[in-house]
Regions:
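An N-terminally biased module of ancient metal coordination in phosphate/nucleic-acid-related enzymes
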Residues: 1-55, 60-61, 124
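Active-site gating/metal-coordination segments in enzymes
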Residues: 49-50, 60-139
């Protein structure tokens, strides 16, 4: 079994802009265009069984939309090997409810990104989020 454990996708209408911003802000060269269909084609070509999508909330207000997309992605594409994690921002004070909801909806884990979320991995907010994620059986 081959698993690509670090992929990103965006809704088709946002993909070009999001990929462009990542390239510009992080100096990241993308090999695909950020669309689920491109990841699926790449998986097939490379013999990848599963790809894990790791969305990132760069603002506290983004978690609802991003996590709704993650749940929809899992419901729609899990059978074809795409599994999306959820996300949370360290400034989300209601992190317990967010994590509990992700777990209830079958999302397997969360993506944290200290650089894009402008904090450090040992930030006490992250430590609280990680502990709560563990308590909710999230990776």
């Amino acid at each position: 079994m081959v698993i690509d454990f670090h992929t990103h996708s965006f809704p088709d209408e946002l993909a070009d802009r999001a990929v462009g911003r990542l390239a510009q802000s992080g100096g990241i060269h993308n090999y695909l265009d950020g669309r689920v269909t491109s990841i699926q084609k790449s998986m097939k070509k490379a013999g990848i069984d599963y790809s894990i999508l790791l969305p990132i909330a760069t603002k506290p207000s983004q978690h609802t939309t991003i996590n709704d997309i993650a749940v929809t992605t899992n419901d729609t594409f899990r059978e074809s090997g795409l599994i999306s994690f959820g996300t949370i921002h360290p400034d989300n004070e209601d992190y317990r409810d967010i994590l509990r909801n992700l777990s209830k909806k079958g999302v397997p884990g969360i993506k944290l990104h200290p650089v894009f979320q402008r904090t450090n991995i040992d930030d006490p907010r992250y430590l609280n989020i990680i502990s709560c994620a563990f308590d909710n059986d999230l990776i």
